[in-house]
Each structure stands twice: as C-alpha cells, then as structure tokens.
C-alpha cells in the first residue's frame, strides 16, 4: 500500500520534515512531480539538509528512494545532490521515463519570464514540460544509449534553430550540450531504472511506499491559481499517474499545512498580511525559499483555500506545521470566508481577483516551541487546532513545534 504526502497550500508547507519524520516506517520514498525548482529543508541532529530533487528518505539507510516519471530532472543539479551523500547504490533510482531539463529550457524560461512575470524560478521547469507535452523531449532512458541520445539531440538542435538568437544560446550550443551530457550522463546512468515496474512489484508484494509531492495544491496547473501556478499537477491524484500505481493502491493522504500561510512569487494571496505582522512571521518562520532564497509573502491561515485543497486531495489526515511561529502573538487571525463585491464566498473560486478576507480572531498563546505532547500545549493553542479540524473536517494527526525532527506531536 502507498501513502501520499501532499502540500495543501502554495508550497513550502514543511513536507520534507514530515517525510523525514515518518520515512523510517517505509520501504520506498518516491518523489512524484516537479523539478529542482522545489526544495525540502530537513534538520537532522542539528545539521540542515536542503534537497531539491532527492526524495526525503535518503537520510534513512533502509529506504529505497525513487525519482518517478513526472519529475523533470536537471542532471547537473542532481549530480551535485548525489555527491553530498554516500552509499546511494541500490538506494536511489531515477525513472527512465522522467524528462531531462536542458540548459536551453532555463534560457527559454528566463526569456519568457521577462514578459509574463509569473514569478517562476527560471530553472527551466515549464519549458521542459512544454517539450514533454509536444513529444519532443529527451528522457532519462535516452541517456543509456548513445545512438538514441544522438538522435534526440539532433532533433532538438533542429527544433530550436529559429530561437537560438532570441534565447541567447551562443554559437557553441551544440558542442556545449554534447559535452554537458558527456560530463554528467556517466554519473547519472547507474541510477536510471524502470521504476514503474519496480513500484508495481513492490505494491504487489505489500511493501510500504511513501509518495512525496513537491510545491502545493494551490500551484496545480489545472486546479491552482492560474496563471500563477507551476507546470505540473501537484495533487495526490498525480502520484498515481507518475508512479504507475493504480488508485486502489493509495491508503492515507496526508495533507501538510502551516499554521499560517505563505506564498513565493506573484499571484493572488487573499490573507496576505502586508503590515509589520507579515514581516514578523517571515523573520520568525525563516520564510525564505530553499531554492531561490526569495523572501516568502506571509499571512494568516486561509481556511477557504484549505478546505478546497483537502477536498481535491481526499486528505485523510493533516499535519500542522510551524505552530511555534505563532507563539507570543496576542491575537491570531484565521480567514474563514472571502468577500467579493459585497458577496460572501465560502467556496474557493477559479479567480481570486477582488477577493478580500473575512477573519475570525483567536486569543494567542505564549509558547509551543519544542512541545512534544498535546497535553503540554496551552489551552488557546489547543482551541486553535480544534477549530481548524472542525472547519476543514479532517483530523490533525501531527503538529510540528520546531524545525527539529523530534519536536513533533503525534495525536
């Protein structure tokens, strides 16, 4: 059976800590979408690990870690991550169906961002998915056969010829790209496998599989705050498509949310707080992007968005992250509905334009940092948690009270 860990905000919810905390109970940990535009930060024994492509199970020696087919892979960046770990043989597997991000994709991404101003990381993620959908991409499995790779490269060079000047690729692009693959392919190829068959077999044997999403539900290309979204499907349903596991294989869907809200880049954010309180949340919560180091926009918890995300993903339980960031705030707000042109909205609309938050205010608490038992939480903190559960209709089973792995309450 497989369990899914999925972000139910705009990403950066703390999925990495949760996966790291529970990975010891699983045989496989699988990253199922996105690219190196996402980042997980894990603190283990006082050491911070920033992962961008690697599944969060790499810190557990017994875990097999898979990068599955809907992930887009920068081979250069993945090689750099691999070099930071030892003994990954028979512990890391990359789907032969996963698509390769080329230097051209990053150039195209930067070019398009100048006019679109979506707020992308300019890592080439979107253009790589574009080539995938256009059936012109290069897959990881192509790196295993020099003849096939050469055919794919020649087709790529022909396709981009009209755009070389616009994307500033340079006269030596073809030679440089061939050298790029000569440098990195030998380091990556030993990890490339048919992970679809591997996971189907593991499921049939009853092995435990944890499926780890990147970004968050509200960035989903179809169901998020379009056009300010990522280029992949970020909901739990995409875990099946990427891995080859059928929907019957899914057991628990664990939705991850912070005790407040954040967003990176542009796009609507109804509960954003642009007063000094937003700055306080950013500073205390260390809200800066793992990948880009960009400051995150911060605000209050948005229950309209949270209920929507829980419904989309079929969440069976929630993990509430960074409760301690709200410590010491006398009045804690929660967005319970939107107002738009005089109308109260309790359902999440396809367009958040002109939506303003309707808040309910709770008395704050002094300290929750480092708490590991629910009985040790102050009454006001417990009331806040109960309200979220009641409104969303999903039980909170885990609460994080600091970045440390052990500072976690299980309910």
Model feature map: region roles:
Residues 1-411:
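Non-transmembrane, aqueous-exposed alpha-helical and coiled segments at domain scale
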């Amino acid at each position: 059976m497989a369990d899914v860990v999925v972000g139910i905000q705009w990403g950066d919810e703390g999925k990495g800590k949760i996966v790291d905390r529970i990975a010891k109970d699983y045989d496989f940990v699988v990253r199922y979408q996105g690219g190196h535009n996402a980042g997980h930060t894990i603190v283990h024994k006082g050491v911070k690990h920033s992962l961008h492509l690697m599944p969060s199970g790499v810190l557990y020696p017994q875990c097999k870690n898979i990068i599955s087919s809907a992930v887009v892979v920068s081979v250069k960046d993945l090689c750099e991550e691999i070099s930071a770990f030892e003994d990954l043989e028979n512990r890391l597997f990359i789907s032969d169906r996963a698509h390769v991000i080329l230097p051209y994709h990053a150039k195209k991404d930067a070019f398009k961002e100048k006019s679109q101003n979506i707020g992308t990381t300019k890592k080439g993620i979107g253009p790589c998915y574009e080539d995938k959908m256009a059936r012109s991409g290069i897959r990881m499995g192509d790196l295993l056969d020099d003849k096939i790779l050469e055919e794919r490269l020649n087709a790529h060079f022909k396709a981009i010829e009209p755009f070389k000047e616009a994307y500033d690729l340079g006269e030596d692009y073809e030679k440089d790209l061939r050298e790029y693959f000569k440098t990195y392919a030998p380091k990556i190829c030993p990890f490339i496998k048919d992970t679809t068959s591997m996971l189907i077999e593991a499921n049939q044997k009853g092995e435990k599989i944890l499926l780890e999403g990147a970004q968050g539900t509200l960035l989903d290309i179809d169901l998020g705050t379009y056009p300010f979204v990522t280029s992949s499907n970020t909901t739990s349903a995409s875990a099946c498509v990427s891995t080859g596991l059928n929907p019957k294989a899914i057991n628990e869907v664990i939705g991850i949310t912070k005790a407040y809200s954040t967003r990176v880049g542009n796009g609507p954010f109804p509960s954003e707080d642009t007063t000094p309180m937003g700055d306080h949340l950013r500073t205390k919560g260390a809200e800066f992007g793992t990948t880009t180091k960009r400051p995150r926009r911060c605000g209050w918890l948005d229950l309209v968005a949270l209920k929507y995300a829980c419904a989309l993903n079929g969440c069976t339980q929630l993990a509430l992250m960074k409760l301690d960031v709200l410590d010491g705030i006398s009045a804690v707000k929660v967005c319970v509905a939107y107002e738009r042109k005089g109308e109260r909205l309790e359902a999440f609309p396809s367009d958040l334009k002109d939506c303003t938050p309707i808040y309910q205010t709770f008395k704050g608490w002094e300290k929750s940092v480092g708490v590991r038992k629910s009985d040790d939480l102050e009454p006001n903190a417990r009331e806040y948690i109960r309200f979220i559960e009641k409104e969303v209709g999903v039980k909170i089973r885990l609460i994080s009270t600091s970045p440390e792995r052990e500072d976690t309450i299980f309910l």
